[in-house]
Amino acid sequence: ARTFAELLDAPLAIIEKRRIGNSDRAELMNVIGEVKGRRAIIVDDEIDTAGTLMETVRALEREGVTEIYACATHGVLSDPAIERIRASSLREVVLTDSIPLPAEKRLPQITTLSVAPLIGEAIRRIHRGESVGALFSSEVSFTQEMLLWEDGIAKTLDMRGVPIETPARP
């Protein structure tokens, strides 16, 4: 979340929460930071049942946030996550395809980004004896370009897998 805030030149707010016992259930405590009248991006490692996500959405709405987006690396999306997301005010939920999303769980609100370019670049770096860790250093991981081979032609892709137009090399 801190890296996103820095890249977007936006303030960071934190939702304080604590786990209840040894369960997966979390209790939200406080919104730390000024969020009234702002757009919020909730950043988490995974969304399972979306219970904590929905509590976070409600807390942000109470604090006067105008639009809410969420992103997570892993979309487990166990029941009742899909119904919770569908019924929520979330504008968009961005996930990676680290866990396949079955057709019945696809919603217009959910955007899935491929991790294939990242994995491909990690494999290329391992093969060439280059640093894999550098892929995950704060700003580099969001702006890293990758050189991939397709049909014998080098293609440069951004981290979303979108081709980047590059000038011809002499």
Predicted regions span which residues?
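PRPP-associated nucleotide enzymes
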Residues: A1-P170
